Design a protein with these regions (language model features):
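A conserved beta-strand element that flanks and buttresses the S-adenosyl-L-methionine
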Residues: 140
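Short catalytic micro-motifs in class I SAM-dependent methyltransferases
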Residues: 143-144
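A short glycine-rich, Lys/Arg-flanked "PGG" loop and its adjoining helix->strand segment in the class I
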Residues: 154-166
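Conserved acidic residues
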Residues: 137
Length: 247
């Protein structure tokens, strides 16, 4: 029997966080809190943004939460509990995560070991500014690009564009520097959270939403901006950037 979307999301949060229980209280509580408190995870599924994408690249993957979320979604769909009014569940052949922090990669490898061993997922400790992105049908970058200078951001985006297959999509969440108080709050929280997770950041390199959109359009993307701060005091925006068809 299919649950209501709200009930389904709660079940999915529990299922996706469960693999982290063996990694310690912090990893498990962080997984539950992030998956339950961040609207982007449910939105990716409800809007079908990753449906049909076989090769997914998650840049700044942390401890692999997006991968665990997609695996839990696929399992739920196979059990017949998928919300009837949602697009089909994503069923990627492989999800590849790139993460700067080695301890997060260790957590991801440990928590999602069955998927790693089955070839469904892989996690690499690397700097996004120099990592090989390979080839992908979808690239996800959530809340990490503003950690590096603008020129480095532009280089990452250009390499993402080169890595995407025809018809590929980039899902990029950013803070809108023109977002007023919400933007200031999100920056303060960002500094606190990244410090707790072992990063040492003195500067965040942010742009107004219009500047992000202009940059992506200049790389050949059609861009749709979707507010992605529901239930939070932040000024976050999800940019759905689809490669334009070449003549």
């Amino acid at each position: 029997m299919t649950a209501t979307p709200a009930a389904f999301i709660q079940h999915l949060i529990t299922a996706a966080a469960e693999p982290y229980r063996a990694s310690g209280r912090y990893a498990w509580y962080f997984a539950r809190g992030k998956l339950g408190g961040d609207p982007v995870f449910a939105h990716l599924l409800a809007a079908g943004l990753l449906t049909g994408r076989q090769r997914i690249l998650d840049i700044g993957c942390g401890q692999g939460l997006l991968t665990s979320w997609l695996l839990a979604a696929q399992a739920a769909s196979s059990r017949g509990t998928w919300p009837g009014n949602w697009p089909d569940a994503p069923r990627p052949a492989h999800v590849r995560g790139i993460e700067l922090m080695a301890h997060d990669v260790v957590r991801a490898d440990s928590a999602l070991a069955p998927a790693v061993q089955a070839g469904q997922a892989s996690f690499v400790q690397a700097d996004m500014c120099s990592a090989d992105f390979g080839q992908a049908d979808a690239v996800v970058i959530l809340d990490v690009l503003h950690y590096v200078p603008i020129a480095a951001q532009d280089d990452v985006l250009a390499r993402v564009r080169q890595s995407l297959s025809p018809g590929g999509v980039l899902l990029l969440r950013v803070g809108d520097a023109a977002g007023g108080l919400g933007f200031k709050i999100s920056n303060w929280v960002d500094h606190v959270v990244t410090t707790l997770r072992g990063h040492r950041l003195s500067t965040l390199y942010c742009r107004p939403l219009a500047a992000w959109q202009d940059t992506l359009r200049g790389l050949g993307f059609d861009v749709e901006a979707q507010a992605m701060s529901q239930g939070t005091p932040f000024a976050n925006v999800l940019l759905v950037a689809r490669l334009r068809a070449t003549p």
